[in-house]
Structures are given as C-alpha cells and as structure tokens.
Swiss-Prot record:
This is SsrA-binding protein. It comes from the Bacteria. GO terms for cellular component: cytosol. It comes from Acholeplasma laidlawii (strain PG-8A). Belongs to the SmpB family. Disulfide bonds: none annotated. HAMAP family: SmpB. Pfam families: SmpB (PF01668). One of its GO terms (biological process) is trans-translation. Required for rescue of stalled ribosomes mediated by trans-translation. Binds to transfer-messenger RNA (tmRNA), required for stable association of tmRNA with ribosomes. tmRNA and SmpB together mimic tRNA shape, replacing the anticodon stem-loop with SmpB. tmRNA is encoded by the ssrA gene; the 2 termini fold to resemble tRNA(Ala) and it encodes a 'tag peptide', a short internal open reading frame. During trans-translation Ala-aminoacylated tmRNA acts like a tRNA, entering the A-site of stalled ribosomes, displacing the stalled mRNA.
Length: 149
C-alpha cells in the first residue's frame, strides 16, 4: 500500500481504538488528482446518512488537464464498507461517545482506499503525556546514536 496522504494530527488528538479500510466513490478527475498527491484529509470527518457512510470536507484539488467536467473540491463522498462494519461503527459512535476519523488515503492494487478509525478524543493532560513520551523516545534515540559513533 502506498500512502498518498495522512492525517498527522489524528494520533496526537485521539486514542485510536480500531481501524477499518474503506473504498471511496470518486469521479475520474478526482482519481487522477489523488494519484498526483493533491488531496488533504486534515479537516475531514465521517458521518452517517440513511445507513450509509460519507466523508465530508475531504479536499481534492481540481485536476489541471481536466475540461469543464471537473469536480467540486470538498464535496461529500460515499465510503464503501460492509454492512457489518457500518453497524459496528454506528453502534460504537452512538453508545461509547467515540468519533470516526480518516487516518490515511492509500493506493492499494490500483484502487484508492481510505483508512478510517474508531477513536476517542484525548484530554489536555493526555496530549502532554504524549509529548513527554515522544521527547523521551527522541532523547533515547539520540543517546544510542551518540554511543554508536
């Protein structure tokens, strides 16, 4: 799987509970633009309508070589999941106070997939703890690197 774009703040702002790989319904110019790496999911979120899953605010830049049939950049796009996965996501979101966020957009065997996650928001002290752990890990790596020289 080739990662095209990722939501870098997701791991900092949320505890990731479970991941799902979903297909996405796109137009031709959107596929070409995503393959060129011109998409962003930093402000995207997942919602449900009539038992179906949709991603909102996913920004896909207009494809330059496309004619008048170009797509709208932040339109609502349908995600393709199995019924059991949709039921699991809907149940967890309503019951446990969890949210569903997009993590990455990937190219898998010629198909574009969106990895979404069932996540729980972090509090401020959790974020501080994450920063401390990251700093400690970085210092350990630097000290090991210094000893190897």
């Amino acid at each position: 799987m080739k990662i095209i774009t990722q939501n870098k703040k997701a791991h900092f702002e949320y505890f990731i509970e479970q991941k799902f790989v979903a297909g996405i319904k796109l137009q031709g110019s959107e596929v070409k633009s995503i393959r060129a790496g011109k998409c962003s999911i930093n402000e995207a979120y997942i919602t449900f309508r009539n038992g179906e899953v949709f991603i909102l605010n996913m920004h896909i830049a207009k494809f330059d070589a496309s004619s008048i049939f170009n797509h709208e950049e932040t339109r609502t796009r349908k995600l393709l999941l199995n019924r059991s996965e949709i039921d699991k996501l809907m149940g967890a979101q309503t019951r446990d106070g969890m949210t569903i966020i997009p993590l990455t957009v990937e190219l898998h065997e010629g198909l574009i997939k969106v990895v979404i996650a069932l996540a729980k928001g972090k509090k401020l002290f959790d974020k501080r703890e994450t920063i401390k752990e990251r700093d400690i890990k970085r210092e350990q790596q630097q000290s090991l690197k210094g000893k190897m020289r």
